[in-house]
């Protein structure tokens, strides 16, 4: 209770001193208008007395818990502060009612209390300052013991605040400097500080009290006013002195901490140094080797997942190798694969370091050592192709004595000649080894249910599979010798300089290029061969295969290839075969297995092969009557990206190998990525309809023979193009085109998310002059890789070699101005080099390559037909830069109006523009929108007398499809292109705003959008129709027309 007694004594002393303070404050307040009056001060004194009595009562009741906060130096410090805290609500009432808010002396009770109840704290600070001054006068202690009325040691508070809080330190230093300046200024007796927060006001109150000054607030309660008093003093120590001590101690501590941390780090580093040194020295020695091992392991795994590296191995060890297993995904070979992936990593002693993880190379033949040639790795491929090993490709086995087609830098998996195995079924041979024939037959039955079975009476089939590895980077000019007698079935590998590039996830039926030929019933020794060329990485040459008829000797035993072609090229070395990365899948079935076809088809008089170079002729040794030679003395047909298939005497309708069609139809299926130009002339003097495609699926006759070489035996080739956006892993759709007498087949198209209306269409077509039909599906793989741009930058105008049609054909192609003119143009049209791309081509031959066969459903227009430029004058030289032909292919659908152009009719006149036909050659980036091909449709069948403004209102649906409407005057449009809406231009001349005076062209963002709009609008009750323009519209022309 000693604290309570001392508190009572102190309070009595304070009462006595209060009276003196009130008198002094009244005298000083004469100079200050805002200071409270004497009565207010007396009232406040009485209130202070009441407050102190209340504090006495509360302290006597014992707040020992809060009294523990008291300062050890001063006896009163915390007890009074706590008592005032509890008595604050009691005091607030009288103070507020009497409006005494003027005098406040710093209250060191609590920082939080001052912030929350600033008015009360300021008033308390005023009282405490009054109590403090008498204390100073009474006890003349040093400033070290200077306290306020609540017993808070101001010195200790200020020192602690200066040390612990940098912000408060700055504020205190500032206040100290201002107060010192005020004390030294004898002219002013008071100083008013600007408004500040309650916490800063509390600091100011305490600093003013520490300097022995009177401190009040103005009427707003925000600004503090200090007055000089008789007890005003300058403390013995400046604030900065306390800070220096603090700084020295703090800096020393921090320095020690940093030094400790550094020492700890050094200890850790010393502990880690041995490990790091060992690791570093190890990595220097083994990093390269380790990298190669991991790299090869990853690539080998990816190769297995892709299943594209279908290298042919004649050794039985192929079935025990896991790396070979991963290369046989599409082959269905799953037997005998017992070796684990660790076996790939165990072989590190090979000199071919990049192939170390693989203990066995799939390019090795029986007993042959691994090829020491470096592989073509994924880094040099077009689209993520795994390692493609180059090595000796064709090896001989115990079953035959085939000559070894080996050339350095070229690995072409050629079929090892196998003995015939008696089998009534057409077998899809996975490996051409006699020991594997039986399981190959089973796998064939499982994988290709659509292949028509060979009749029982036929001789045993000989199964061959050719898997082509990567061609060499530099072609070898060595001639290739091949002995045809050792192989009953001739497999002619043809290597174009551009490689095929297939997506990673094509469906199994079309996952690889397969060329299978099934002999007809009349064939003496029918054979079934399946070609599965692996995906070829970017490389000058790609090996393709042209298969001759089975049971007959090779047409030419000695093939001397040109220096441009790889020596493995047995047939034709395509000189400049310009083709973007793509893969062609060809499945060819003779008509003998087609039950509905009783007709005999003539063989092709004109070979379908690669044309090596202009004027080049390949020798042929012998020809069997039932087999047309793969190469003839004639100029080789220009073949831009498709495999030419020679047809025996008995060749029927060609169609897709779909299970739905079973053994009824035989087809030629071609898969490839977009952007190449394709020419497949079938028959001598046949017309080439080159149908390169970029985005859209389409089925159009690719070639029709109408001239004297094959008056009735020409086999038209139809393309079916499907862009990668429409595949999405689905099997490609193939159009089935039949001879005129055959019934129609319902062919459900594979689902295409981009073109839902084309889910099911009836594909029926009539061969132009002969019943034979070749259906080629050009299926774009939907892989993650972007379509590679071919080196060709131009397409010459399509020379379609008099695309006139025979009268007996139900649907006719558009004919040019005249067949002689077209042929003349073909022969004289030069190939425009890439550097000449901006220059217009002088070719004026037929540019519209799309046929108008009414029963032929066209999936989508082919955007870019390519044309010949060199060669024999009719066919473009392979490898020459192709020019884009700005022709628009009509998206003919079943039930859509056909466009029949009779012989002599100039439906597509390029002559009206002469040789000034504007051609915008596509640059290397074929995705540019300069070439307007399948994206342009003409608006026809508008209501008569409709004006342009009214017509624009009808085109809202086109605008919703993203189409831009271009109004071309008749001078710019094609006569008659408006479908009759501009036929009355003469009489409508007085109505310049009539829509009939214009050729209305809708330019869609993509051929697919044009296709969908044509399907939607032409089949609806819309007041206009859309059709593919008969004229080649250059985008520049359309832009100029739109700007007028």
Curated annotation (Swiss-Prot):
Biased composition (Polar residues): 509-521, 554-572, 818-848
Record field: compositional bias (Basic and acidic residues): 36-56, 109-143, 261-270, 277-288
Annotated keywords: Nucleus, Phosphoprotein
Domain named SUZ: residues: 233-303
Chain positions found as Phosphothreonine: 924, 928
PROSITE patterns: R3H, SUZ
Ranges of residues in domain R3H: 169-232
Record GO terms (molecular function): nucleic acid binding
Annotated stretches, region: Disordered: 23-71, 106-147, 261-288, 320-408, 433-485, 502-533, 551-600, 729-770, 807-848
Alphabetical list of CDD domains matching this protein: R3H_encore_like
Residue pairs linked by disulfide bridges in the UniProt entry: none
Compositionally skewed regions (Low complexity) per UniProt: 338-349, 433-449, 757-770
Protein name: R3H domain-containing protein 2
Gene that this sequence comes from: R3hdm2
């Amino acid at each position: 209770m000693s604290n309570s007694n001392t508190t009572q004594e102190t309070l009595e002393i304070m009462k006595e001193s209060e009276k003196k303070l009130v008198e002094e404050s009244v005298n000083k307040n004469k100079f200050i208008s805002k200071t409270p009056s004497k009565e207010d001060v007396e009232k406040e004194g009485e209130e202070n007395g009441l407050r102190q009595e209340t504090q006495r009562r509360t302290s006597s009741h014992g707040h020992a818990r809060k009294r523990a906060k008291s300062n050890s130096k001063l006896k009163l410090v915390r007890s009074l502060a706590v008592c005032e805290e509890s008595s604050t609500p009691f005091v607030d009432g009288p103070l507020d009612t009497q409006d005494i808010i003027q005098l406040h002396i710093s209250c060191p009770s609590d920082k939080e209390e001052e912030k929350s109840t600033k008015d009360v704290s300021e008033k308390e600070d005023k009282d405490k300052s009054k109590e403090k001054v008498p204390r100073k006068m009474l006890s003349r202690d040093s400033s070290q013991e200077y306290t306020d009325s609540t017993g808070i040691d101001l010195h200790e508070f200020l020192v602690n605040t200066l040390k612990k809080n940098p912000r408060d330190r700055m504020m205190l230093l500032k206040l100290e400097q201002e107060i010192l300046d005020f004390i030294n200024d004898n002219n002013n007796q008071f100083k008013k500080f600007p408004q500040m927060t309650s916490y800063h006001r509390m600091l100011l109150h305490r600093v003013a009290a520490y300097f022995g000054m009177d401190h009040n607030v103005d009427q707003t309660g925000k600004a503090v006013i200090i007055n000089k008093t008789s007890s005003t003093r300058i403390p013995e120590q400046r604030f900065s002195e306390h800070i220096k001590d603090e700084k020295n101690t703090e800096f020393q501590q921090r320095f020690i901490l940093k030094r400790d941390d550094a020492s700890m780090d050094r200890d850790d580093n010393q502990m880690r140094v041995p490990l790091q040194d060992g690791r570093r020295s190890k990595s220097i020695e083994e990093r390269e080797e380790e990298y190669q091992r991991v790299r090869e392991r990853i690539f080998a795994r990816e190769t297995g997942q892709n299943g594209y590296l279908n290298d042919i191995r004649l050794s039985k060890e192929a079935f025990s190798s896991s790396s070979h297993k991963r290369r046989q995904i599409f082959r269905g070979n799953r037997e005998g694969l017992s070796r684990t992936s660790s076996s790939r990593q165990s072989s590190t002693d090979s000199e071919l370091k990049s192939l170390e993880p693989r203990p066995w190379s799939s390019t090795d033949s029986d007993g042959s050592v691994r090829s020491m040639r470096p592989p073509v790795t994924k880094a040099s491929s077009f689209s993520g192709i795994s390692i493609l090993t180059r090595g000796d490709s064709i090896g001989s086995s115990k079953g035959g004595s085939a000559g070894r087609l080996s050339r350095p830098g070229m690995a072409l998996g050629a079929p090892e000649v196998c003995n015939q195995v008696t089998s009534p079924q057409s077998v899809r041979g996975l490996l051409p080894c006699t020991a594997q024939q039986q399981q190959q037959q089973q796998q064939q039955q499982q994988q290709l249910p659509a292949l028509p079975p060979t009749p029982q009476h036929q001789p045993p089939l000989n199964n061959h599979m050719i898997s082509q590895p990567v061609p060499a980077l530099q072609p070898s000019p060595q001639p290739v010798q091949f002995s045809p007698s050792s192989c009953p079935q001739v497999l002619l590998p043809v290597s174009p300089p551009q490689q095929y590039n297939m997506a990673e996830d094509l469906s199994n039926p079309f996952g690889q290029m397969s060329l299978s030929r099934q002999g007809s019933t009349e064939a003496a020794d029918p054979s079934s061969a399946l070609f599965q060329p692996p995906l070829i990485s970017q490389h000058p040459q790609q090996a393709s295969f042209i298969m001759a008829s089975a049971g007959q000797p090779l047409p030419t035993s000695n093939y001397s290839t040109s220096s441009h072609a790889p020596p493995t090229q047995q047939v034709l070395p395509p000189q400049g075969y310009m083709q973007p990365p793509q893969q062609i899948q060809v499945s060819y079935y003779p008509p003998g297995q087609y039950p509905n076809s009783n007709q005999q088809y003539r063989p092709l008089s004109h070979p379908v092969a690669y044309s090596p170079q202009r004027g080049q002729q390949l020798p042929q040794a012998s020809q069997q009557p039932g087999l047309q030679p793969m190469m003839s003395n004639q100029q080789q047909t220009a073949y831009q990206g498709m495999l030419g298939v020679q047809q025996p005497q008995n060749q029927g309708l060609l169609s897709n190998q779909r299970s739905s069609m079973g053994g009824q139809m035989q087809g030629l299926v071609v898969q490839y990525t977009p952007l190449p130009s394709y020419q497949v002339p079938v028959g001598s003097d046949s017309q080439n309809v080159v149908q390169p495609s970029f985005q859209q699926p389409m089925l159009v006759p690719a070639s029709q023979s109408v001239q004297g070489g094959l008056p009735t035996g020409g086999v038209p080739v139809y393309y079916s193009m499907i862009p990668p956006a429409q595949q999405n892993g689905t099997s490609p759709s193939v159009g089935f085109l039949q001879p005129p007498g055959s019934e129609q087949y319902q062919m459900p198209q594979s689902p295409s998310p981009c073109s839902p209306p084309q889910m099911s269409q009836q594909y029926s077509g009539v061969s132009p002059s002969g019943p034979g039909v070749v259906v080629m599906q050009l299926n774009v793989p939907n892989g993650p890789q972007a379509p590679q741009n071919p080196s060709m930058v131009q397409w010459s105008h399509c020379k379609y070699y008099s695309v006139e049609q025979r009268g007996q054909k139900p649907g006719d192609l558009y004919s040019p101005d005249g067949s002689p003119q077209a042929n003349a143009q073909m022969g004289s049209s030069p190939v425009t080099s890439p550097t000449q791309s901006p220059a217009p081509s002088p070719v004026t031959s037929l540019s519209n390559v799309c046929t108008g066969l009414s029963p032929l459903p066209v999936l989508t227009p082919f955007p870019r037909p390519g044309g010949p430029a060199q060669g024999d004058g009719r066919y473009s030289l392979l490898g020459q830069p192709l020019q884009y032909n700005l022709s628009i292919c009509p998206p003919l659908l079943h039930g859509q109006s056909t466009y029949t152009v009779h012989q002599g009719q100039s439906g597509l006149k390029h002559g009206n523009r002469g040789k000034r036909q504007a051609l915008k050659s596509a640059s290397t980036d074929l995705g540019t929108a300069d070439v307007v091909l399948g994206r342009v449709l003409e608006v026809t069948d508008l209501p008569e007398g409709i004006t342009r403004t009214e017509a624009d209102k009808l085109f809202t649906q086109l605008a919703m499809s993203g189409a831009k409407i271009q109004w071309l005057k008749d001078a710019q449009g094609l006569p008659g292109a408006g479908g009759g809406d501009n036929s009355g231009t003469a009489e409508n001349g007085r109505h310049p705003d009539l829509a009939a005076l214009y050729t209305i062209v809708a330019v869609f963002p993509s051929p697919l959008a044009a296709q969908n709009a044509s399907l939607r609008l032409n089949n609806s009750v819309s007041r206009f129709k859309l059709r593919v323009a008969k004229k080649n519209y250059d985008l520049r022309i359309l832009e100029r027309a739109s700007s007028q």
